[in-house]
């Protein structure tokens, strides 16, 4: 039997695997990836023996740091990061929720200073707990739960 790859291999870069279906676009925003400047291979809602369905994001030519990759845990807590060199996986690790999240989440409190258009203040959230995953706004102390994070990601 001949097996064909649906998504081509990359020579050097980062592969984010085991992403919940439909999360690849949000992850691109979290990582501040500009698809007009980066070669990307995005597979959305593909079959997975582990998850049933999943997304895969291949970022060619860019090795994500562990700190960058850990931001992915906000929407994909079981994601796997594969660092690829010379078409082979050189490193592999699971993401972990970051201690601090800056700039790309919006505070749900409409009265928070970060939501005042006259004040150019970026959001800063500090992790309060891992299970359940919760973050607290540094400015207004509002808590953000894991189930709220996806809807609070700022559009690019």
UniProtKB/Swiss-Prot annotation:
GO molecular function: metal ion binding
UniProt KW keywords: Metal-binding, Pyrimidine biosynthesis, Zinc
Keyword Repeat in annotation: no
Record Gene3D superfamilies: Aspartate carbamoyltransferase regulatory subunit, C-terminal domain, Aspartate carbamoyltransferase regulatory subunit, N-terminal domain
Disulphide bridges: none
Gene Ontology CC, one term: aspartate carbamoyltransferase complex
Domain of life: Archaea
Pfam family of the protein (one): PyrI
Entry note: cofactor: Binds 1 zinc ion per subunit.
Binding-site residues, Zn(2+): 107, 112, 137, 140
One GO BP: pyrimidine nucleotide biosynthetic process
Cofactor: Zn(2+)
Quaternary structure and interacting proteins, as annotated: Contains catalytic and regulatory chains.
HAMAP family referenced in this protein's UniProt entry, alphabetically: Asp_carb_tr_reg
Family: Belongs to the PyrI family.
Annotated NCBIfam families: ATCase_reg (TIGR00240)
Function of the protein: Involved in allosteric regulation of aspartate carbamoyltransferase.
Identification of the protein by name: Aspartate carbamoyltransferase regulatory chain
Protein source organism: Methanopyrus kandleri (strain AV19 / DSM 6324 / JCM 9639 / NBRC 100938)
Higher taxonomy: Archaea, Methanobacteriati, Methanobacteriota, Methanomada group, Methanopyri
């Amino acid at each position: 039997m001949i097996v064909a790859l649906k998504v081509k291999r990359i020579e050097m870069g980062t592969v984010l695997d085991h992403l919940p279906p439909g999360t690849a676009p949000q992850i691109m925003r979290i990582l501040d990836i500009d698809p007009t400047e980066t070669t990307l291979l995005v597979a959305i809602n593909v079959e997975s023996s582990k998850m049933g369905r999943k997304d895969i994001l291949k970022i060619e030519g860019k090795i994500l740091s562990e700190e960058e990759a850990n931001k992915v845990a906000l929407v994909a807590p079981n994601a796997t990061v594969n660092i690829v060199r010379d078409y082979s996986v050189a490193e592999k690790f699971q993401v972990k929720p970051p201690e601090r999240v800056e700039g790309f989440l919006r505070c749900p409190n409409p009265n928070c200073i970060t939501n005042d258009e006259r004040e150019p203040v970026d959001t800063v959230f500090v992790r309060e707990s891992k299970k359940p995953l919760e973050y607290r706004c540094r400015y207004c102390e509002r808590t953000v739960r894991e189930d709220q994070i996806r809807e609070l990601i700022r559009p690019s």
